[in-house]
């Protein structure tokens, strides 16, 4: 496969085969080409391949893997955080310098992101250079070496990465919220615990990759590439680890509370209960409920005064605040509730007023106008998100890992429209009656404990 000189091959990667050129379909001459339909293939080993030839000047390929932090255990916490930083380390087929310089030379980009469920390795570049980036993507995900000295050099970056992320109090509160809500799996942090920084070893990285980066846990998604060629690459180079890998533990919701007292004048608080599994009809009801209550301002720098939560809290305090509904769905659980930011002295009034507003809906006080407006906001938000190629790639990859298929936007909109008022009221009732979890940070002298709510 071509490198900087356009004359290299995959001979160093796996010496048995030479990778085909990953070229996009040539655009027809004359009239502007029309994007093709999304093509989906599931190989016998469980690997899912999907592609959309949209004739964009930029090609994007993502390898999505069921290997998020939920698959760690108490002995290897922080492994996925370090994995996110190792994409430029030496592999069996390319040195660290070769990867970095090769991507840089063509103006490409290799990024690694992770959620509690999945990891995603994504490359993007001009469509004529996609074969170069594909080689590096395959090297990084299938043939890492994790040399001890290179891994050791990355350890301080864990601390910096975490410190930068935690400059936003919301990041820390959401991390604490999951730790309070679950006993295992989804309780695992996205960022390496402080006591593990400097202790994550190359052996732990190898073990995690060997047992979770298997074909049946992967989905290869491409935009602006040919499906037959992408399928050929997957069959040749992503078929080296069969089986399902290590199965992860089912998330066990318990309910709990984590309070972090500090000197901040603003109190950040998240107050939730267990909701619904991603992709279920009940999860759709919680999504509509989120937009009934208020999921954030729809006018840039707007005051969000049309939000039901905002209106309720505004009657309880004259001090500045922010409030929105919180909603997170996973493959075997979910969290729904309220996120508030307030002055320390008003924290109790803000949280209680927001909670009482959800109780009002649980009692059946819900108009058809509010429901239709919420559905419109939810549908518009979804459609606008998948207009972005980055978000579309992520959406297809996530669906491929969960269901092995793709649900088109038209079907998603139909499911949103099918949510009845009674479904939304039942979702509110489930939150009100459910075992609560809470995380808060700031000057918490006026912040109620979870059992006081």
Swiss-Prot record:
Instruction: Quote the annotated effect of residue 208 to Y.
Output: In a colorectal cancer sample; somatic mutation
* Family matches, as PROSITE patterns: INSULINASE
Q: Tell me the residues on which N6-acetyllysine occurs.
A: 66, 199, 250
What are the GO BP annotations of this UniProt entry? aerobic respiration; cellular respiration; mitochondrial electron transport, ubiquinol to cytochrome c; oxidative phosphorylation; proteolysis
Chief location: mitochondrion
Keywords assigned: Acetylation, Disease variant, Electron transport, Membrane, Mitochondrion, Mitochondrion inner membrane, Primary mitochondrial disease, Respiratory chain, Transit peptide, Transport
Membrane topology term = Peripheral membrane protein
UniProt entry tagged with the keyword Ribosomal protein:
no
Quote the InterPro entries the UniProt record gives: Metalloenz_LuxS/M16, MPP/UQCRC_Complex, Pept_M16_N, Pept_M16_Zn_BS, Peptidase_M16_C
GO cellular component annotations, sorted alphabetically?
mitochondrial inner membrane; mitochondrion; nucleoplasm; respiratory chain complex III
- Gene Ontology MF terms: metal ion binding; metalloendopeptidase activity
Does Transport show up as a keyword for this record?
yes
Segments spanning the bilayer are none
Q: Where in the cell is it found?
A: Mitochondrion inner membrane
Transit sequence range:
1-14
Q: Which family does it belong to?
A: Belongs to the peptidase M16 family. UQCRC2/QCR2 subfamily.
Quaternary arrangement and interactors, per the entry?
Component of the ubiquinol-cytochrome c oxidoreductase (cytochrome b-c1 complex, complex III, CIII), a multisubunit enzyme composed of 11 subunits. The complex is composed of 3 respiratory subunits cytochrome b, cytochrome c1 and Rieske protein UQCRFS1, 2 core protein subunits UQCRC1/QCR1 and UQCRC2/QCR2, and 6 low-molecular weight protein subunits UQCRH/QCR6, UQCRB/QCR7, UQCRQ/QCR8, UQCR10/QCR9, UQCR11/QCR10 and subunit 9, the cleavage product of Rieske protein UQCRFS1.
Q: What does this protein do?
A: Component of the ubiquinol-cytochrome c oxidoreductase, a multisubunit transmembrane complex that is part of the mitochondrial electron transport chain which drives oxidative phosphorylation.
Disease link: Mitochondrial complex III deficiency, nuclear type 5: A disorder of the mitochondrial respiratory chain resulting in a highly variable phenotype depending on which tissues are affected. Clinical features include mitochondrial encephalopathy, psychomotor retardation, ataxia, severe failure to thrive, liver dysfunction, renal tubulopathy, muscle weakness and exercise intolerance.
Protein name, per record:
Cytochrome b-c1 complex subunit 2, mitochondrial
Annotated organism of origin: Homo sapiens (Human)
Show the taxonomic lineage: Eukaryota, Metazoa, Chordata, Craniata, Vertebrata
């Amino acid at each position: 496969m071509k490198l900087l000189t356009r004359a290299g091959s995959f001979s160093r990667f796996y010496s048995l085969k030479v990778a085909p050129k990953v070229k996009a379909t040539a655009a027809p001459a004359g009239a502007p080409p029309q994007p093709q339909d999304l093509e989906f293939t599931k190989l016998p080993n469980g690997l899912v391949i999907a592609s959309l030839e949209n004739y964009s000047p930029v090609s994007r390929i993502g390898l999505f893997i069921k290997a998020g932090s939920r698959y760690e255990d108490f002995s290897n916490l922080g492994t996925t955080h370090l994995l996110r930083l190792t994409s430029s380390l030496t592999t069996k087929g390319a040195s660290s310098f070769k990867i970095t310089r090769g991507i840089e030379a063509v103006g490409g980009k290799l990024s690694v992101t992770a959620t509690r469920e999945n990891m995603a390795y994504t490359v993007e570049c001009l469509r004529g250079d996609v074969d170069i980036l594909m080689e590096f993507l395959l090297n990084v995900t299938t043939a890492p070496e994790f040399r001890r000295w290179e891994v050791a050099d990355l350890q301080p970056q864990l601390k910096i990465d975490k410190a930068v992320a935690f400059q936003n109090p919301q990041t820390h509160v959401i991390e604490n919220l999951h730790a309070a809500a679950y006993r295992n799996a989804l309780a695992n942090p996205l960022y390496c615990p402080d006591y593990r920084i400097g202790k994550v070893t190359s052996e732990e990285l190898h073990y995690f990759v060997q047992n979770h980066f298997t074909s049946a846990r992967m989905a290869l998604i491409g935009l602006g590439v040919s499906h037959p060629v992408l399928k050929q690459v997957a069959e040749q180079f992503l078929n080296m680890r069969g089986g399902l890998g290590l199965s992860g533990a089912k998330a066990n919701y318990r309910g709990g509370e984590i309070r972090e007292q500090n000197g901040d004048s603003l109190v950040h608080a998240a107050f939730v209960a267990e909701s619904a599994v991603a992709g279920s009809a009940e999860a759709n009801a919680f999504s509509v409920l989120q937009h009934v209550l208020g999921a954030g301002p729809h006018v840039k720098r707007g005051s969000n005064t049309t939000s039901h939560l905002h209106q309720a809290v505004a009657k309880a305090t004259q001090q500045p605040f922010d409030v929105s509904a919180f909603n997170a769905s996973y493959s075997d659980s979910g969290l729904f509730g309220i996120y508030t930011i307030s002055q320390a002295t008003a924290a109790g009034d803000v949280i209680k007023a927001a909670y009482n507003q959800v109780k009002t809906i649980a009692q059946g006080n819900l108009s058809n106008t509010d429901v239709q407006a919420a559905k419109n906001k939810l549908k518009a938000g979804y459609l606008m998100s998948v207009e972005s190629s980055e978000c579309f790639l992520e959406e297809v990859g996530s669906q491929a890992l969960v269901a092995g298929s793709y649900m088109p936007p038209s079907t998603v909109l139909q499911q949103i429209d099918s949510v009845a008022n009674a479904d939304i009221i039942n979702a509110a009732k489930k939150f009100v009656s459910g075992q609560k979890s809470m995380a808060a940070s700031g000057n918490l002298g006026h912040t109620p404990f979870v059992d006081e709510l």
